[in-house]
Amino acid sequence: MLTAQRVGFYLPSCALSSYSSQVYPVLFRFGSLLIPSYGALAALGVLTGLLLVQRTARVVGVSPQQMWNLSVLSLFVALAGSRVLLIAVNWSLLRMHPGWLLGLAMVHHPLLAAVGAALAIGAAACFTRWQHMRWDATADAAAPALAIGFAFEQIGALLSGAGFGTPANVPWAVTYADPLAERWSGAPVGVAVHPVQIYCALAYFAIASVLLYWLPRRQQQGDIAGAWLVATGAVVFFTEIWRDRVGRGEIFEKFLDGPQIAAILLVLVGAYLLRRRTAAAISGAVVIAGAGNE
């Protein structure tokens, strides 16, 4: 039986210390059982995204059941594939500590996210082709849900210390007090840092709101997906300015890091998609006008 002494509940403190508020990597504690903040918020983001994509699928004319199957398949492939890579890279350590396998789902790293995203895109492409789904309409339906999911994931990252920010001397800075934040994510304990994850989360919520408003009013298929790619790339690129770069890869004499390179690619792909769709619409309008003149 659980007692008040054996149950801990952790959330960001609303009270500010001299410079910052504290955040914690453990959301719930039931005796020796820990519920990590990152895993709980990421799961909430997945659930919210799955529920939302059922509604957006109807708006774009895609079967909600097909969209559900596509989403679940992509999530499974992304998680399983990235964890297999993690096991392969750390096989010698995991052989000595097999119990660590239970915590692999909670590990967060930009490389794992990139591998998971690539695998998910591949799985989604195969599924849409197999099910004869329109890829542009499917991408439009998925975009707002992905933005919502990323927002919750970033809130979880804030609480756990994953992707922590650079040292800051601002009233809204956060400080990690739990040693688990350092052990799990490498976050500095006792140092006030930028809550860069909240910057991202707020931006993603704003993107999702705009896309949901725009979705039923879009002029052509693919507009929402293209806009999401451009906006997401811009958010990632600029928020990396306040994110600690340890373990994120750097090129051009530390001018850019790995996520910023990925962000540039997202913007380019999104811009190409929007330009291609716009060019096609203009071409169609010219053909129609020419036929009318005849």
Language-model-detected regions and their locations in the chain:
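Cationic, low-complexity basic patches in intrinsically disordered or flexible, solvent-exposed regions
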Residues: 6
